[in-house]
Structure formats: structure tokens, C-alpha cells
């Protein structure tokens, strides 16, 4: 099971996911393991490249509801983070710096999406944040994490103008690979 799970975590290609499903589907004797494997396959297929990114609702700092679908027509770069996450705090200024290089582009939005359970800690944390990144708090962090197959943060996601997943697990902004991946699709 662990080999199958690791194989799924290492690919976002729909064809490879289908191969993994075929390779492992009859190898589990325990019904709970089989069910867990099937759920992992379903999650991997939902997050495969080219799939429509699952819509979610979030709240901005004014308490207004925003949906992912409201950004159709723009590239969306998402930083999934929380106030209690040390690595998230480390990556945040680097994410902000990259967002700043694209600030003149009307067809790109950078979103810092908090998955904090308590919105009040998020409100305190974002009060001094730069305006180049839209600060949002996801309405249901558990549902969002399941939808996007997120088991750890920070996580960086790139969504295309038509709402399709381009990369559901971008490299960290502290690496050159982050900007290289963005430059394949975006123009500053």
C-alpha cells in the first residue's frame, strides 16, 4: 500500500495514475486497505494536470465571500498556509516577492489562502501584509484539504485561466524552480 500511495503522490499525470491503479488494484487483501487505495486513486485523478480545479469558498479580510470560480479568466497562484506553520512563514516573503514581479499583469492573481481553524489569528497576522497578494481564509479547511489532497503545508498551486490545474504542487518560492515553473505559463 505504501508503495502505491507514494507512487500516487509523485505523479500528477492522469495516464500514470491509471497505470498505478491497474498495477495495484488487485493486490490488497484487506477490504479497508482496498477502500483506502480506491480513495487515494479518486483523489489523485481529481488533482491530475488539466482537471478543473475544485471550487472553494473563502473569506477576505472584510468578511466578504470569494470563490475560486470568480477568478476564471486569470491565472491563479495559491499559497496554502497557516499562522502556526513555521515553513509557511519562511516561504511567505518569498511568495510576496514573486507576486511583486507580476503586479502589473491583469491576468494573474496571487492568493495567500489560510487554512487556520480560528479566523481571528489569521486577521491579526495579515494586517501588515502587502497588497500584491490577496489574503483569503478558506471557509472549511477540512473540506478544502480533502478536495485538494493536502496533507501538509505550505502547498503552492497554479491554476490556468480556464480553471484547469496546471500544477497542484509547485516547488517552494525559495527555490529557482518556483519561478521557472511560473515562467513556463506566465509573463511578468
Sequence positions of predicted segments:
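Conserved hydrophobic packing residues within short motifs/helices of P-loop NTPase cores
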Residues: 78, 111-113, 157
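Active-site acidic short loop of glycosyltransferases
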Residues: 72-74, 105, 131, 150
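Thiol-/selenol-based redox modules, centered on thioredoxin-like
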Residues: 161-188
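Alpha/beta-hydrolase fold active-site loops
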Residues: 75-76, 154
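Oxidative protein folding and maturation machinery
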Residues: 1-66
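Short, internal strand/loop/helix patches
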Residues: 59, 123-162
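Structural microenvironment flanking redox-active thiols in thiol-disulfide oxidoreductases
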Residues: 90-129, 140-146, 180
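Conserved redox-active cysteine motifs that mediate thiol-disulfide chemistry
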Residues: 72-73, 80-97
Amino acid at each position: 500500500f505504501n508503495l502505491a500511495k507514494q507512487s500516487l503522490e509523485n505523479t500528477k499525470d492522469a495516464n500514470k495514475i491509471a497505470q498505478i491503479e491497474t498495477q495495484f488494484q488487485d493486490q490488497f487483501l484487506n477490504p479497508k486497505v482496498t477502500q483506502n487505495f480506491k480513495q487515494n486513486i479518486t483523489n489523485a485523478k481529481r488533482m491530475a494536470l488539466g482537471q478543473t480545479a475544485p471550487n472553494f469558498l473563502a473569506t477576505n479580510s472584510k468578511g466578504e465571500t470569494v470563490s475560486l470560480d470568480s477568478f476564471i479568466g486569470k491565472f491563479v497562484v495559491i499559497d496554502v498556509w497557516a499562522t502556526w506553520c513555521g515553513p509557511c512563514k519562511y516561504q511567505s516573503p518569498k511568495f510576496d516577492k514573486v507576486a511583486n514581479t507580476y503586479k502589473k499583469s491583469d491576468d494573474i492573481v496571487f492568493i495567500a489562502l489560510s487554512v487556520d481553524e480560528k479566523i481571528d489569528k489569521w486577521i491579526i497576522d495579515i494586517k501588515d501584509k502587502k497588497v500584491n497578494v490577496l489574503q483569503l481564509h478558506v471557509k472549511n479547511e477540512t473540506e478544502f484539504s480533502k478536495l485538494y489532497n493536502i496533507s501538509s503545508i505550505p502547498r503552492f498551486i497554479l491554476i490556468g485561466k480556464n480553471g484547469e490545474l496546471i500544477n497542484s504542487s509547485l516547488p517552494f518560492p525559495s527555490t529557482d524552480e518556483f519561478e521557472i515553473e511560473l515562467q513556463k505559463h506566465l509573463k511578468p
